[in-house]
Amino acid sequence: MNVNFDDFQPVTGELPASVHMIGIGGAGMSGIARILLARGIRVTGSDVKESRAVVGLRAMGATIAIGHDRTNLELAGEGELPDAVVISFAAIPKTNPELAGAHELDIPVLKRSDVLALLMQDSKALLIAGTHGKTSTTSMTVAALQAAGLDPSFAVGGLMSKAGVNAHQGSGDVFVAEADESDASLLTYQPEVAVITNIEPDHLDFFGDDETYYAVFDAFAERIKDGGHLVICAEDPHAAALGERAVERGINVLAYGGEEALAKHPTLPVGAVLHGWTPVDGGARVEATVGSTSVRFELHQPGRHMALNALAAMVGGDCVGADLGRMARGLGEFTGVRRRFDYHGSIGEGPFVGARIYDDYAHHPTEVSAVLGAARELVTEAGRGKVIAVFQPHLYSRTRNFADEFAAALSLADKAVLLDVFGAREEPLPGVDGALIANKMTIPVTYEPHFTSVPARVREIAEPHDVILTIGAGSVTMLADEIVRELSGDNDEQVES
């Protein structure tokens, strides 16, 4: 084992009265900042650029500087240092001047996950974990509980489309959040209910091997409070195996999935059964049993995986006392999460009439397969068009480790455009680029390493009524609207990666 899980213990204690957050505009950090501000904590922070998140936090009372500088530690006033500095574990290098200054001044440094644990410690924590689907399932859970009148606090890894926010301090006693496994930080939490959607090797740059990655979820299950529940998807073999081990250890387990999958695991107590799932109007009609109650609702989102995520939300909500009928109505009104099969536009006239453009955060082969499967449903339902994947690999290590799997997943599309790797926190690796995947694919593919040329490459291969997806966790999201403009004939503006 390359990671010592004993180094990750549940975090409890008092919230600091003031914090300085480095990288405050990030998806996870900005959500924590919103809740801290709502609780009356003094918040300062810094980020590399202005953003909607930064503007919104300033409006709530945060003092935020653009650019990183040691003097930012005194944004609250000259000589007034924060009680703690908060960082997102993977994103902030040790050479950051504010982080280095905090160490020199003996200011405690907390990870984002530490602060989230402190925020949740007096609530019923309903946490969503798993390799894929965390943000969608967390957002669905929030929507379901809100419809049931519980007003939960929540912290989500993306912006909920309807609410336009990623976090909220609620009046209820339930706190819904994602439990991120990428750096084992989920082990700092003590959930009342833990949902695990699936388990598949990822983040091997941190864990080192598959077995250590699997083991972090077993350790997470051990963090569940006495009398709490572990909710797992029986359709995922590793999640189901974890559920079976948890049953043997005396943990309360509830499984969800289709009838066939549940029948393969007879020792797993059943929380929900998916009886029917029918694509309709770009979404799906769902028929299921949750506990002993039959429910029917329609989702706005395509893909069977989204129906399973909805069941996870209902089982988790049932564990904290939410009304099933009201949750089902809430799921029917759920409009999605930005960057999760996020609709950007369609072409109304011209040579590409009827083409639809979506954007998705998928950055693992299984996620790519799921999103392309959902896109296939749309063209099948329409009876015309093809699926075009515009994919930007994320991280050099992940591209190297999963090149074959990415090639197979992307080959579920009809055509593809491959960008170069979005390295994020990593340095380039020799021989690792978008072509590494493109050369292994079995469908027509264009490798385009020049970011601003991608919309033109899409135009060369697009046809009427195609479903076109920009896919990846990096800057590829900026191209969705550019492709809409390119295919509409309004391509005067360009973006830079």
Please place each PLM-identified region on the residue numbering.
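N-terminal Rossmann-like NAD(P) cofactor-binding module of classical short-chain dehydrogenase/reductase
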Residues: V86, V195, L469
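Conserved SAM/SAH-binding loop
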Residues: G67-T71, V115, F451
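Acidic-glycine-rich active-site phosphate/pyrophosphate-binding loop
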Residues: H275-V295
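BRCT (BRCA1 C-terminal) domain core and associated BRCT-interaction motifs
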Residues: H68-A84
